[in-house]
Amino acid sequence: VRGAKVLADVDGDGIRDSNESQGTSDTSGSYVLNADPGSWMLITSGGTFLDSKGNEVNALPMKAPAPTTSGATSNITPLTSLVAANPSLKAKLDALGGDGWNADIASSSGVPGKLLRVAQAVEQVMMALSTGSNAILTSDSSKLKTLDKLADAFAMQENISSNESLAAATQEGLH
């Protein structure tokens, strides 16, 4: 995602305060924050990405746990958003292969299909609710709260990448 505001949210309110670092992602999606490792949360707002047809699409807000070491790389994706909302999903996503929950889902070197299935399910549900003239979720806050509900629903599933689990989690997460 390029052009996204990336916030190191210390107090969890999703709003930048004077003591919170913020940066903007560049054309490759990279960003730099001047923040010590800690118990804060990464939150994005705005930005765009190219879909599979090369069309520019507005990005959804996402989040990720703070890096645990200084200078660490942290991806911010639908997968990290699930883990930020429900840390118990780390183990389930890691079991799906590759870099697990912190996978770069846009990597040209590939990502395990099971991880992509989960990421795409989350993204498709969120896009369906957030785009178009009849969008149900219009604020970043409402979108992030819905991501939290989806994370809790995914955490209740045994095999989170199966068709049945994806359907059950997305249905339960929207109730």
What does each model-found stretch correspond to?
Residues 1-175:
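Feature for extracytoplasmic/surface-facing segments of secreted or surface-associated proteins
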